[in-house]
Amino acid sequence: QGASIAAAVALPGAVAAQGRPVLKAGDQKGGLRALLEAAGGLEGLGYDIQWSEFPAAAPLAEALNAAAVDSGPIGDAPLIFALAAGTRVKAIGANRSDSYGTAVLVRPDSPLKTAADLKGKSIATNRGSIGHYVTLKAITSAGLKPDEVNIRFLAPADAKLALTQGSVDAWATWEPYTALAEVSRHARVLVSGRGLLPGLSYLAATDAAIAAKRPVLQDFLQRVVKAQLWSYRNVDAYSAALARIIGIPPEAAKLQFERRQQKWVAIDAQVIADQQGTADFYRQVGLIKQPLDVKGTFDTGFGVAG
């Protein structure tokens, strides 16, 4: 815990008592805080960071909607739900990665072999998560309809337990949970998101934070970009640090990190088109009721130069 990280709750407004700005940063397990701490990316801050960790993107999106956090990492699917709910939030940076680790998992001894075998089966995942997204893409790509499977909405810890105990047939999740399940041999990948998903995630921020703390957000995004570049130059060091910070075996940390191959990219026409495709898919399967134009969900004025 560096001295630059604000451990206490910030005073009302954007500025702490000592006159330094405060960034209320949401995060997920094994996310930006772990990356920045491992890379030394929190040194020399001109502002304090008040961290809040969430078990999944959906509660993080709710926190953004409530302005409980200023910014945080969120997947393409949860961003769609946030837009549909009227959340005043925008993506300020885009990240592309290999989607293998966003996957539908089954027990090692499961008789299920393909996505088509999920017909009539129960699948645990978070509502509105990328796990929910890969579930729907997997079953529709196999010719099934959403109502031909039983989706049970559970948080990751509960979903993992349900799969292990046999109360569900499958668990749709993401990294680092997928790598951890594989390394511990508690589950195997039935269907991966590779080839099904565009592999997009974002750093999102509230409209209010963008208006009031734009230089802080730009600096924070740039630190994240630089930390990620550092991580791929120092795979072993980062994997060891990630394992220590989030409490998972080093081999699981390294597995999920190496295969994700993440890269921050500019928010361009292709990113927006891919996000529009996700929104259109959700309309197609009935999860959102109205057509959505996603262009307004992006602020293209933030740079991501390495």
Q: Model-derived features: where do they sit?
A:
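N-terminal export signals
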Residues: 1-17
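Short, glycine-/small- and polar/acidic-enriched structural segments
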Residues: 17-145, 150-153, 169-173, 188-190, ...
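Solvent-exposed, polar/charged alpha-helical surfaces in well-ordered, non-transmembrane soluble domains
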Residues: 34, 62, 66, 80, ...
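Soluble non-cytosolic domains of exported or imported proteins
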Residues: 55-58, 73, 125, 129, ...
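Secondary-structure end/capping motifs
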Residues: 212-289
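Conserved C-terminal helix/tail region of periplasmic/extracytoplasmic solute-binding proteins
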Residues: 283-306
